[in-house]
Amino acid sequence: MMKRNLLTVALLALGLSVGAQNVICHIDPNAIFYVGENALVYNGGGVETKGNGVYDIRGNVMVVGTSSDSFKTLTTGGGSKSDGGNFILRLNNPANFASSTYGQLYITGLSQGNISGIVDKEYRTKKHGTYQQIALPFYNKVISSLSGTASTIGTLGKTFSNVRYSKNEVLTWTNATAVSDNLNVSAVTPKNTTYYMLGSLGLDTSAPPATMPANAPAPNGSVYTLKGRPYANGATELLRNAANGINFGPGGTNTNSYNERYNSYLQDNWDYTANPSNPWSVATFGKNIYQFGNPYFTNLDLSLIGITELATITDNNAISSIQGIRYDPGTVVSAPNVGTYSVAAQFVNFTAGAPVPVGDVGLIIKPMQTFVIKLRNNDAELNGNKTLNFDNLRRFKNTPRASATNYSVTAARFASENNGTVKQLGIIGLDQNGEELARTYFAVYPTATTGQTSEPTVQSILGSDNILGTFEESVNGGIDPNYANSYWLYINEANENDFFGKALPLSLYSSSIKFLKFEVRENTDLVADGVHNLSTGIGFYYKAANGAISEIAQNQVIPVSGDQYNLYYGKSLVLGTDVTSKPSRTMVVYNGSIDKFVVRFDPLWKKSDIKVYDMSGKLMLSQKEVSTSQDFEINLAKANAAYIVTAVSEKGEKISSKIIR
């Protein structure tokens, strides 16, 4: 089939000439070289277009050459052509951009000085809130060229400025100082792996203005088109010293070079659960975090960066200290007197030792996407275990590569290797039409920790607006009441031996969830549809509201019959401790930006009565009919004393939490 695709591509090229010095593929004026979806074109040398000649790419193109080869877009007269419109990387289904395929370009061997051609990259993706998290894989691109009217191709249809906090500025993340720095709009793109944050006032990347032009035949208003010179291969990053030596201060109250409190923007979803009452006291909280943008016009496959592969040709990465990857920034919120933070970000976390990913294990980063890596430590590099090499992460497919398969950009997809011990259950909430609304994960393995621990785990927390998740479990099964009103979890881990057959409560907080779909994996690999037992001969179970205990099978879908389920790994004579009602999402949490504990309310609560007692039972604070539209600040003097906080909703739902202030 691939040969047929290649042949078709060749026949569709009009005016194609071969043989110019250091150029294998030359596209003359008025010619179109069309690369269809799923097709692959290999160029063993340089490539150039002339005049209005077009390389229209809906599939995959490889340009493999040497330092003397070139990648050019030329005018009819032979000069350098810089306005684009020649090498076009298409978004094949803009209306369904999240699932659409797209054209990809792989360049290797060419020197940066010989890459002068302009690539047009069609861009449309979900909006990230107040600041768009983005990679700009364009060499030496002037930042102000992103500015323009809603009818100017090559721009984002707005004007960027240098005014911090205006939501019109361009920011870049600096790993060493843990700061978002202003990038002057007169500057050029500073580095191939830079993580950018574009102020999104007047910008919706999911819905281009109707007047925004596109390269024909794409209709106006269907995509943004960003233009620039691609980077040469060779991108690497040393993963050391992120925020090393920085004193964040008590509760993150120290300030950075912009006089911003660290706790107003710096998040560490990985280390939060180590001490939820004061996460900033954890030695590694906010440190060893590295933010990058994809430097290339190909996907990046991050699934194997933490392991020593079985293949002969690998991705050249074995970062054994990896703790997790944030692969989706969620929604960025900027709140007055609070700061800027991310909500509903998505994570893949890794077990310790010989890392195995847990969570959304796909780990494919698309062109122009960003990602964040958290390491467990800042140890010195040993045999390259702290260097991220980007070149062999490049991949055309949107599925991970198997570790036993030799690396190439076209390598086969991930296949079962049956040598893992991480068993993972994904629970996906679907609406009436079968569309995904939310998901959560339950993972078990021999070295996992049951219940709360101060040590790093694969767990990630949820916010009050999430609608599906689990809570920290008690070692005997059920919810640990000590943490039920402190946090709940997107990824939850338990030890497969000491939590065998015990209940992990699953809570639903939306009547829109009509079905639950189950996704069963072992060591990241999906088991076959309909299969229950894993390699241990043991599988997952669920208990519904009617009390029936049922096996869970891969790709199984069940109708929702209540808002509380129990999940189990393994079936024992006594299946753990059940929970008869789900906890509230109202939490008592520490807000470092104001140095106070706050009550953060479940969105279903309208009003609340709040009381605070000291440990002798004396009432210290009482307030009735508190509005739940914002956090309630608990105003207590610092005395290193313990208190009990209670909150009761207008319907009588009650939460209680212990704090130390």
Language-model features, listed with the residues they occupy:
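Compositionally biased Ser/Thr/Gly- and acidic/asparagine-rich
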Residues: G202-D631, A637-A639, S649-R661
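Extended, domain-scale alpha-helical bundle/helix-rich regions
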Residues: V185-L201
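Extracellular recognition modules
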Residues: I644-V648
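Conserved "landmark" site that anchors the functional core of diverse proteins
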Residues: K127, Q133-V170
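Sec-dependent, cleavable N-terminal signal peptides
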Residues: M1-V23, E653-I655, I660-R661
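Extracellular beta-sheet-rich ligand-binding/adhesion modules
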Residues: A10, L14-G109, R376-N377
